[in-house]
């Protein structure tokens, strides 16, 4: 008899997690609490409630939470303050959602007195690591059930057979072979993996993309937008203030319309393998370009360079599941400190897959001094004679080394 009496399941309402729900009831003879997160994935979530009820889950044990604002405000925006990119390209759309889901799972564990959490991540991927590192960081003694590491339902056929034998409804798409891709979506991105994408030499089919038009089919006329920044975060689009999640949703709409944000990537998973995935991150692509633009006039040079030096480590921490680790929190304090004066506006041109910065301004925090930088008469603001001594001092070590090399010959 298991000592696990109550489990909080991260539940989508789809086939896999519905099978997991029934499997938990049968294998552990335990009470199941379901948790479904609305992260802006664009799916109707009420069916998840109805399916949970069909499994005998009590209404008060079904959690369907709208986390869109918290997701963007407390996770996506802090990440973009660092200009975060993993391996030069990936904007971490899946990675950044997992710590919030882990946090909410633990909150529900504490609220319901559950013994364990359960997730549907496979034993091959990064998500199992992200969910579990987050859970252990927030509740060290929590138990974790990962069915894909325990059961023998390791093929689509076995999963379907289990569902059929236990009366779990099977959508027609699953009977016909399922979705052609494994997809994950939230307000920041949508990802595609599996099937023919497992051949890294094969081009993704055009009808795969859901959020963006092909750049070739994007409007022939460019569209200009203005983003307003306060302490490193976008607070308004074209002068209209809006909550964080509405900012990202609007940028997704604008970017998708203009074919912005497509990515085909082979990435290095934390568990050791290489994986090919395709991503659409229209709003995030705009955010990254705009944030670097506003920082270009408001950040000190050495602070900006320090941020760039630290960014790959920060990105790896998020990708690998260490959002709740002390080193990520420490880096966040530094990053947030640098954003105190990142205020102003950025004007962008959106055109056929491109985000083009056409202007940036900060009334009170710009370090750009036109009286010094001008090519015209600066009225003595900058004494060009000073540059000679500056250059000689910086060249000193190289001159000494060159003289030594000459003597060695």
UniProtKB/Swiss-Prot annotation:
Record's keyword annotation contains Ribosomal protein: no
GO cellular component: cytoplasm
Protein name as catalogued: Argininosuccinate synthase
Family: Belongs to the argininosuccinate synthase family. Type 1 subfamily.
Catalytic activity: L-citrulline + L-aspartate + ATP = 2-(N(omega)-L-arginino)succinate + AMP + diphosphate + H(+)
One Pfam family matching this protein: Arginosuc_syn_C
Cellular compartment(s): Cytoplasm
GO biological process: argininosuccinate metabolic process; L-arginine biosynthetic process; urea cycle
PANTHER family linked to this entry: ARGININOSUCCINATE SYNTHASE
Chief site of localization: cytoplasm
UniProt-annotated binding residues for L-citrulline: 90, 95, 126, 130, 182, 191, 267, 279
Annotated positions binding L-aspartate: 122, 126-127
EC number assigned by the record: 6.3.4.5
GO MF terms held by the record: argininosuccinate synthase activity; ATP binding
Subunit annotation: Homotetramer.
């Amino acid at each position: 008899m298991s000592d696990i009496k109550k489990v909080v399941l991260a539940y989508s309402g789809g086939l896999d997690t519905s099978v997991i729900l029934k499997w938990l009831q049968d294998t552990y003879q335990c009470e199941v609490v379901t948790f479904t997160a609305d992260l802006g994935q664009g799916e109707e979530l009420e069916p998840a409630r109805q399916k949970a009820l069909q499994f005998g889950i009590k209404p008060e044990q079904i959690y369907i939470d709208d986390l869109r604002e918290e997701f963007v405000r407390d996770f996506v925006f802090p990440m973009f303050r660092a200009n975060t990119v993993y391996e030069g390209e990936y904007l971490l759309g899946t990675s950044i959602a997992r710590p919030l889901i882990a946090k909410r799972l633990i909150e529900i564990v504490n609220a319901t007195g559950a013994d364990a959490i359960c997730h549907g991540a496979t034993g091959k991927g990064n998500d199992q690591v992200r969910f579990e590192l987050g859970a252990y960081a927030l509740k060290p003694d929590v138990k974790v059930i990962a069915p894909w590491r325990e059961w023998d339902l390791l093929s689509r056929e076995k999963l379907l057979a289990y569902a059929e034998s236990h009366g779990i409804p099977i959508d027609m798409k699953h009977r016909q072979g399922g979705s052609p891709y494994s997809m994950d979506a939230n307000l920041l991105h949508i990802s595609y993996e599996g099937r023919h994408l497992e051949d890294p030499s094969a081009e993704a089919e055009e009808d795969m993309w859901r959020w963006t038009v092909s750049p070739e089919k994007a409007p022939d006329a460019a569209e200009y937008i203005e983003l307003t920044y306060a302490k490193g975060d976008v607070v308004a689009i074209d002068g209209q203030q809006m909550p964080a999640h509405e900012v990202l949703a609007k940028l997704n709409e604008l970017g998708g319309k203009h074919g912005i944000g497509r990515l085909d990537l082979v990435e290095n998973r934390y568990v050791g393998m290489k994986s090919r995935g395709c991503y659409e991150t229209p709003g995030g692509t705009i955010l990254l370009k705009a944030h670097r633009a506003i920082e270009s006039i408001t950040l000190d040079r050495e602070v900006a360079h320090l941020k760039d030096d630290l960014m790959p480590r920060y990105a790896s921490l998020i990708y690998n599941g260490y959002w709740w680790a002390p080193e990520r929190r420490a880096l966040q304090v530094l990053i947030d400190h640098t954003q105190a004066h990142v205020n102003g506006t950025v004007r962008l041109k959106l055109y056929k897959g491109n985000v083009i910065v056409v202007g940036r301004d900060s009334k009170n925090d710009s370090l750009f001094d036109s009286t010094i930088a001008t090519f015209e008469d600066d009225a003595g603001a900058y004494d060009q004679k000073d540059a000679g001594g500056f250059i000689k001092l910086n060249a000193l070590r190289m001159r000494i080394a060159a003289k030594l090399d000459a003597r060695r010959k």
